């Protein structure tokens, strides 16, 4: 049964909705704060660029984000209001680097009609009050007292009903607002009001301005000394104050965002709907405004926010394309643009459609999305895990270890790759043709297995074998010194760095050597009570060539110990528990924090934070990476250090926001890895797998990889055709001038290169609404079917459309058949060898007929009326599930004998659907326009017709995201041996660029996780005191109901980021061991 569902985010929202700049984390630091609908990110502006400081979820959809500075404060506070009428004031706590809540509250009213034009939240520049416009005809005031604390809120009646914008004016003795509104004759005006806090009412303001530009949409208040306000229209810009009125015409455009450049407010950046950025200058003599000037600077992504940072650097936040960090130059480039893009921040939003395909044919799903809009439209290929891009490979069996060596210590690149086998050691090097070929290092022993090698100080190399340690010159390649194991002893385990060697011989002997110029000196020897299983002396202190600590893994008592060097004094001993010995230990530092990693023989990995001065270990965490022994090695990529864990499920361990993250590598089993940074293959890795050695470069280190295919137009529908290895898309061309009607196309793309192979233009006013790849009964060909609508300006709903059937021949789209329809073809499905179409309010079934002349046509077989608009359709067997514009979900059945479709059951609630999917025979999933998810159940066991005719709502959840599409599939390799491999998953894509996964869990697992979720709610407090329970409660205009049969995977997986103490609190409340909790939550993270 798919009643118990787990909802988790695989890709966080990336669409930027708000941004602001100020001194938030300290009085001296300049911060950029970015809102991505349900998350906020805090960045620090440094000479090197933006440095992320915090990224946290907000339990609400952010409607307002404003920085302000209450009286007597040295730095700014952050005000956030959410769409569900909650607000909070946040302050930065430098001690814990977290947000503290200064104030919070609920500003909803029992009665009141929510505003059509979105909520407005503004703060008086003198911090006397916060103003909110949430309901038509009401202005809510939250006053500050003189200590900067918030007092009780009250409402003031506002006679303007169609409010477009409200802003506080600067330099007014009493708090004053300017209101831009539209009257009932569609004319636009601005009025000003003083807010009297004493009388809790408005007083007529200092000025008003009637009959503005019909497209006036935005007010920009101007700070002192000039004061007043700018009114931005589609064809004019007006400056207005009590004493002045100036206007200039502009090229027709819709301004979407603005950013103030100077403190005195004389210059503003304006971003329009086409991504053009302008500079608006208020010319003035002292405090008298003399005029306005506007200049085009260049093109950016289509801006939803603009924040001027410093030194001509600007953040452009976008909801329709990638956000950007740009520099405004004094002189234009060759194309006449003053805008230079310094950095791009990927945004998948809005994901209008997507499909799940296995492009590499490796059994791993990739999601290909239709992302962005207008000129910023693109396809994005999203896959989980880190790819290795193979540069060279050679067949080699039985590799036991690998190390790279330089020809001198200060060389930038590696020269040699030492490969060790059971009874020999081979040395490979790059020849002049950039090929790996065998060479010799005369001082190395080649007829034995090498246990360890390393570059050493004084241009030397060190080789450890089972009998000796050899020190060799890297320039002459001759032996300079050798240390022999005592008679009767052999070296079992060894490690080294540039100036130290640590090895263990049988019988628990630990021997420590130091490397001099041509000299190996045995410095210390210790006898331990058990055999040693692994060693590490990777330097993580200030000296890159010398370590003061050694990590030693032990047999028998299954412990890891930290010794000091050179004394070999035991500092710390940590029992690992269990029967499995440590196979690999590693000292490493990520983002300035030192860790000890310890890998066990069964694929588990423990990590500890480590105090390098005392050697003490804390914050122990255990994760399961695979099922086979793991070997750990560090490597660097883009100047950051990461760790590669080689095993049956190779993994890269890295750090982000001071948390350790694990990302799977898209390779089957890897036995050994070492960095190999050669001149021919810079920043590469050498990887030993079953029977071969591969040299390859590694992708950027992150969990999801996103490849962008810019289209320069808006792709609206996509599907993949395996047989022809192509994608079919319906797209809308980007017309530069708005006079022409827009053009729509069906395009064919190669599924590897993503190049356009063929294009079929649709008629004028014809939109592509749906696309499908399918085959028909008694016809072995595979076709692309496209459903269209003629969208005519004078019609409310399309009254005609077409179904087009194409075949791909020699890489071209050939039209085979077309069928006119009496409406828009919103959805197409392959159905029992026929074609099922949703056309306006009806469902229509077509069969594929062969005419006498050998041509083919679609012939209508039967249909079903009874929908408002049948927008989304899914099928399974003979069942058809329909998502309606406003009548929720209904279930239809096709009857073969009668050749008819009839309604079986429906959900009688009024839900405006945005997507549907079938989870199993009886449970159907839907998303609707209030950002909720719901599941309904077919009640075949019902006693009466009435019961059987009702789809019962069994699950409800507030996702807080608008879902455009569900698809069955997975982003991860399905490993048959894991429990997770058996869990069915559905992927969804949203307007804010979220890719999420809904997993249907067994009941026992669901019940366990439900307990964990409620324990976590008590421990993890929402930012700003916002409640998780309220946030996830199903909510529409009519009712609010607690979430049921859906769990929040993002909250559950945040368990892994808690400190050990908090984990233990939860473990006590649930009566389950911390390790067991970690293991079960870890498993879930593998779903995405």
Swiss-Prot record:
Q: Where in the cell is it found?
A: Cytoplasm; Nucleus
The answer, when asked if DNA-binding is one of the entry's keywords, is: yes
The metabolic or biological pathway listed in the UniProt record of this protein is: Protein modification; protein ubiquitination
Key word Cell inner membrane present in the record? no
Q: Which UniProt keywords apply?
A: Cytoplasm, DNA damage, DNA repair, DNA-binding, Nucleus, Phytochrome signaling pathway, Ubl conjugation pathway
Which Gene Ontology terms of cellular component type are present?
Answer: Cul4-RING E3 ubiquitin ligase complex; cytoplasm; cytosol; nucleus
Give GO MF terms, alphabetically.
DNA binding
Query: Where is it predominantly found?
Result: cytoplasm
Query: Which InterPro entries does this one have?
Result: Beta-prop_RSE1/DDB1/CPSF1_1st, Cleavage/polyA-sp_fac_asu_C, RSE1/DDB1/CFT1/CPSF1, WD40/YVTN_repeat-like_dom_sf, WD40_repeat_dom_sf
Lineage, top-rank taxon, reads Eukaryota
GO BP terms in the entry = DNA repair; negative regulation of DNA-templated transcription; protein ubiquitination; red, far-red light phototransduction
Q: What does this protein do?
A: Component of light signal transduction machinery. Involved in repression of photomorphogenesis in darkness by participating in the CDD complex, a complex probably required to regulate the activity of ubiquitin conjugating enzymes (E2s). Repression of photomorphogenesis is probably mediated by ubiquitination and subsequent degradation of photomorphogenesis-promoting factors such as HY5, HYH and LAF1. Plays a role in DNA repair by forming with DDB2 the UV-damaged DNA-binding protein complex (UV-DDB). Component of the CUL4-RBX1-DDB1-PRL1 E3 ubiquitin-protein ligase complex.
Q: How does it assemble?
A: Component of the CDD complex, at least composed of COP10, DET1 and DDB1A. Component of the CUL4-RBX1-CDD complex. Component of the CUL4-RBX1-DDB1-PRL1 E3 ubiquitin-protein ligase complex. Component of the UV-DDB complex, which is composed of DDB1A and DDB2. Interacts with RAE1. Interacts with WDR55. Interacts with ATCSA-1. Interacts with DDA1. Binds to ASG2; the subcellular localization of this complex depends on ASG2 farnesylation status. Binds to KTN80.2/DWA3. Interacts with HTD1. Interacts directly with DHU1.
Q: Tell me the PANTHER family matching this sequence.
A: DNA REPAIR/RNA PROCESSING CPSF FAMILY
In the record, the note on similarity to other proteins reads:
Belongs to the DDB1 family.
Q: What protein name applies here?
A: DNA damage-binding protein 1a
Q: Mind giving the lineage of the organism this protein is from? A: Eukaryota, Viridiplantae, Streptophyta, Embryophyta, Tracheophyta
């Amino acid at each position: 049964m798919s009643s118990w569902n787990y909802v988790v985010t695989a890709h966080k929202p990336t669409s930027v909705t708000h941004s602001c700049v100020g001194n938030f984390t300290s009085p001296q630091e300049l911060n950029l704060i970015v809102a991505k609908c349900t998350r906020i990110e805090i960045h620090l502006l440094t000479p090197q660029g933006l440095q992320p400081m915090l990224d946290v979820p907000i339990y609400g959809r952010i409607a307002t984000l404003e920085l302000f500075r209450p009286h007597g404060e040295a730095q700014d506070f952050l005000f956030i209001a959410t769409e569900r009428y909650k607000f909070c004031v946040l302050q930065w706590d430098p001690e814990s680097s977290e947000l503290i809540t200064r104030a919070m509250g609920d500003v909803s009213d029992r009665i009141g009609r929510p505003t059509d034009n979105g909520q407005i939240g503004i703060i008086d520049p003198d911090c006397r009050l916060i103003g909110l416009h949430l309901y038509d005809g009401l202005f809510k005031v939250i006053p500050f007292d003189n200590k900067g604390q918030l007092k009780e809120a009250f409402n003031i009646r506002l006679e303007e009903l169609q409010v477009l914008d409200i802003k506080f004016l600067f330099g007014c003795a009493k708090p004053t607002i300017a209101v831009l509104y539209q009257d009932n004759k569609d004319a636009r005006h601005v009025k000003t009001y003083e807010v009297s806090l004493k009388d809790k009412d408005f007083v007529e303001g200092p000025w008003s301005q009637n009959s503005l530009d019909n497209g006036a949409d935005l007010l920009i208040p101007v700070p002192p000394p000039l004061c007043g306000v700018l009114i931005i229209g589609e064809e004019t810009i007006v400056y207005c104050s009590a004493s002045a009125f100036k206007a200039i015409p502009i090229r027709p455009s819709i301004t979407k965002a603005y950013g103030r450049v100077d403190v005195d407010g004389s210059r503003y950046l304006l971003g329009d709907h086409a991504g053009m950025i302008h500079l608006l200058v208020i010319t003035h003599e002292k405090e008298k405004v003399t005029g306005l000037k506007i200049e085009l600077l260049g093109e950016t992504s289509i801006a939803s926010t603009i924040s001027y940072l410093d030194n001509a650097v600007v953040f452009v936040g976008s909801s329709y394309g990638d956000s950007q960090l740009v520099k405004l130059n004094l002189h234009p480039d060759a194309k006449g643009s003053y805008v230079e893009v310094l950095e791009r921040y990927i945004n998948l939003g809005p994901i209008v459609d997507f499909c799940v395909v296995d492009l590499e044919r490796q059994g791993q799903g990739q999601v290909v999305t239709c992302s962005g809009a207008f000129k910023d439209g693109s396809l994005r290929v999203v896959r989980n895990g880190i790819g290795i891009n193979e540069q060279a490979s050679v067949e080699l069996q039985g590799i036991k270890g690998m190390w790279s060596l330089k020809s001198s210590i200060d060389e930038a690149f590696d020269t040699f790759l030492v490969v060790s086998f059971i009874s020999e050691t081979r040395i490979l090097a790059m020849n002049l043709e950039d090929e790996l070929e065998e060479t010799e290092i005369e001082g190395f022993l080649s007829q034995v297995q090498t246990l360890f090698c390393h570059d050493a100080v004084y241009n030397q190399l060190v080789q450890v074998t089972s009998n000796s340690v050899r020190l060799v010159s890297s320039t002459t390649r001759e032996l300079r010194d050798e240390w022999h194991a005592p008679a009767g002893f052999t070296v079992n385990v060894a490690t080294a760095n540039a100036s130290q060697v640590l090895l263990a011989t049988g019988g628990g002997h630990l021997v420590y050597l130091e490397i001099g110029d041509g000299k190996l000196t045995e410095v210390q020897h210790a006898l331990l009570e058990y055999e040693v299983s692994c060693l590490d002396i990777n330097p993580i202190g200030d000296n890159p060539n010398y370590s003061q600590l050694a990590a030693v893994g032990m047999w028998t008592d299954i412990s890891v110990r930290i010794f000091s060097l050179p004394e070999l004094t035991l500092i710390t001993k940590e029992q690992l528990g269990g029967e499995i010995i440590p196979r690999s230990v590693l000292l490493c530092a990520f983002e300035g924090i030192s860790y000890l990693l310890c890998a066990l023989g069964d694929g588990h990995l423990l990590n500890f934070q480590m105090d390098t001065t005392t050697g003490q270990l804390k914050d122990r965490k255990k994760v399961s990476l695979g099922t086979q022994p793991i070997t750990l090695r560090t490597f660097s990529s883009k100047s950051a250090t990461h760790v590669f864990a080689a095993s049956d499920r190779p993994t890269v361990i890295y750090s982000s926001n001071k948390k350790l993250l694990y990302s799977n590598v898209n390779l089957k089993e890897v036995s050994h890895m070492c960095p190999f940074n050669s001149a021919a293959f810079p920043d590469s890795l050498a990887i030993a797998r079953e029977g071969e050695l591969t040299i390859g470069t590694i992708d950027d280190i992150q969990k999801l990889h996103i490849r962008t295919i810019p289209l320069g137009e808006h792709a609206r529908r996509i599907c993949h055709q395996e047989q022809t290895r192509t994608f079919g898309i319906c797209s809308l061309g980007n017309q530069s001038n708005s006079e022409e009607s827009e053009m729509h196309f069906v395009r064919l793309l190669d599924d590897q290169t993503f190049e356009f192979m063929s294009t079929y233009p649709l008629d004028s006013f014809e939109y592509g609404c749906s696309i499908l790849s399918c085959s028909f009964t008694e016809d072995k060909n595979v076709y692309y079917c496209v459903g269209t609508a003629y969208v005519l300006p004078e019609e409310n709903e399309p009254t005609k459309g077409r179904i087009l059937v194409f075949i791909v021949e020699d890489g071209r789209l050939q039209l085979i058949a077309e069928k006119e329809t009496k409406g828009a073809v919103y959805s197409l499905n392959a159905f029992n060898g026929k074609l099922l179409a949703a056309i306006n309010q009806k469902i229509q079934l077509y069969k594929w007929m062969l005419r006498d002349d050998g041509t083919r046509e679609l012939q209508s077989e039967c249909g079903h009326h009874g929908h408002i608009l049948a927008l989304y359709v899914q099928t399974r067997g003979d069942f058809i599930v329909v998502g309606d514009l406003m009548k929720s979900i209904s279930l239809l059945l096709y009857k073969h004998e009668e050749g008819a479709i009839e309604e079986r059951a429906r959900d009688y609630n009024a839900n405006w659907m945005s997507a549907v999917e079938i989870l199993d025979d009886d449970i159907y999933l839907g998303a609707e326009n209030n950002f909720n998810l719901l599941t309904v159940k077919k009640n075949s066991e019902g006693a009466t017709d009435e019961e059987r005719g009702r789809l019962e709502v069994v699950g409800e959840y507030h996702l807080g995201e608008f879902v455009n599409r569900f698809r069955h599939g997975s982003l991860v390799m399905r490993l048959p041996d894991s429990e997770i491999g058996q869990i069915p998953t559905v992927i969804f894509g949203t307007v804010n660029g979220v890719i999420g996964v809904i997993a249907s869990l067994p009941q026992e697992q669901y019940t366990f996780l439900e307990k964990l979720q409620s324990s976590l709610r008590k421990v993890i407090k929402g930012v700003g005191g916002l409640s998780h329970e309220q946030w996830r409660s199903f909510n529409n205009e009519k009712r609010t109901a607690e979430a049921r049969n859906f769990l929040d995977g993002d909250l559950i997986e945040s368990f892994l980021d808690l400190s050990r103490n908090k984990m233990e609190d939860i473990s006590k409340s649930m009566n389950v061991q911390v390790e067991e909790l970690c293991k079960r939550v870890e498993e879930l993270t593998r779903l995405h």
